[in-house]
Amino acid sequence: MKTVGVLVFGDRRVPGSLSGLPVHRADGPADVDTAIGDYGRLVVVGADAELAAVLTRLLRADRLDVEVAYAPPRRTRATRIYRVPAGRRAARRARRGAARRVTLIRDETGSAIVGRAAWLPGDDQRVINGEAVVDDTTLFDGEVAAVRIEPTLAMPGLRASVQNGIWRRWVAGRAAQLGSTGVTVVRDGVSASRAARRSTFYRHVEGWLLVR
């Protein structure tokens, strides 16, 4: 039987169905790292960015053997992608559900995403100027307004779409790569502090263990 711990982010309340389990309030990476060492299953009570932060710490610690249950208060982009419930149903399933390995999408910095990443124009720029590919398919070459990247539950693991007035069709693949004059990288709603000329999101060789 896996030992189960609860990671609660911010001032969120612990769902009643998780009562009796050890609870850790997480304010930063150090709090996540502390919990990783103690449990075989972690229940994340938070938002997509916080679930991604937990997966990032597991990835960097080489602890993708830890099962992860997601119990956000309400539905999110990640719950739709990975087809898991939210609220009370999610909390109940966190204790009783079985884990299965699903695709893990990360970037070159070792940061995971679970809902959506985006490439947006860099500082003082109106458009992205560059070129992006998904596997062997050219996503764009020239100027675009924005690019969004999402994990997919099915292989090959991710999909990307370009905005140029309207959002174009999705292109699926294992990796999305960009070379540009400068973009702002956004991961699950959190913008990087500095602009980047290159960025890559790709399917990690090993997935993460999602409790479903």
Each predicted region: which residue ranges?
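Catalytic core of DAGKc-family lipid kinases
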Residues: 2-38, 45-188
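Extended, charged low-complexity segments
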Residues: 179-212
